[in-house]
Amino acid sequence: MKATSEELAIFVSVVESGSFSRAAEQLGQANSAVSRAVKKLEMKLGVSLLNRTTRQLSLTEEGERYFRRVQSILQEMAAAESEIMETRNTPRGLLRIDAATPVVLHFLMPLIKPFRERYPEVTLSLVSSETIINLIERKVDVAIRAGTLTDSSLRARPLFNSYRKIIASPDYISRYGKPETIDDLKQHICLGFTEPASLNTWPIARSDGQLHEVKYGLSSNSGETLKQLCLSGNGIACLSDYMIDKEIARGELVELMADKVLPVEMPFSAVYYSDRAVSTRIRAFIDFLSEHVKTAPGGAVREA
């Protein structure tokens, strides 16, 4: 007997999610039904597709080859159906978006009202995460991510580029003065990230040409928290321009060592899974973000 499309879809879901239980939850089926479908598929093929242990699932050699082919076939089927539906569908339904808190507050927040006015049938759910999450496990449709994409199962649409600036409040400067060199900076209270540690490497070069790794006196996993600490005069921070430029323009923050800061670019992208047919609401949202970046006032964001 030939395998059914439902059996193929269940098999791919099990592999992508990493377990029968997660696949069952995503598909809205019982664990036993999902397990039976995969066993039935293996019986039809006459081979074992999965190595099953109490701790994890892994693909057999035959399973690996079969998974790649089946996944590609299902993607093409979904894409074909999506293309047909898109010709007559208006964007609608729930759209789940994940981004770090500063991105939500300073990039996405001004766009929510105009997006909903244009697409009133789309319901938005915003999630703020300070760490990288698994989009499938958290049921996220689109994530706004900084840095270079490394996961081959994801697609990314470049949105804008950001550059970090070293800043302090006027109150802090009046009490402790302005650092002019890295040696000066070492004598000041610096605000750092508990994670990711890479953000504690500031874009200023030491005498050996390497970027300076700051030793911090206060830390947080949230850039927005560090910004508030900085505004309150607690120390010197190094944060992305898109989240502090307004405060600099208003005189609430002062840019430091501008002549020594290197233009280390940080790209931001809209990220989504490549194994899904892109729904009209996902495409509409990403297109809307790209449109905003192209038409934003100078200095708001730098188009990627």
Swiss-Prot record:
Membrane-traversing stretches: none
PROSITE patterns noted in UniProt: HTH_LYSR (PS50931)
Domain HTH lysR-type span(s) in chain numbering: 1-60
UniProt record, GO biological process: regulation of DNA-templated transcription; response to ionizing radiation
One Gene Ontology MF term: DNA-binding transcription factor activity
Pfam families: HTH_1 (PF00126), LysR_substrate (PF03466)
DNA-binding region listed in the record: 20-39
Keyword set, alphabetical order: DNA-binding, Transcription, Transcription regulation
Family: Belongs to the LysR transcriptional regulatory family.
Record-linked PANTHER family: HTH-TYPE TRANSCRIPTIONAL REGULATOR, TRANSCRIPTIONAL REGULATORY PROTEIN
Protein name, as recorded: Uncharacterized HTH-type transcriptional regulator YafC
Organism: Escherichia coli (strain K12)
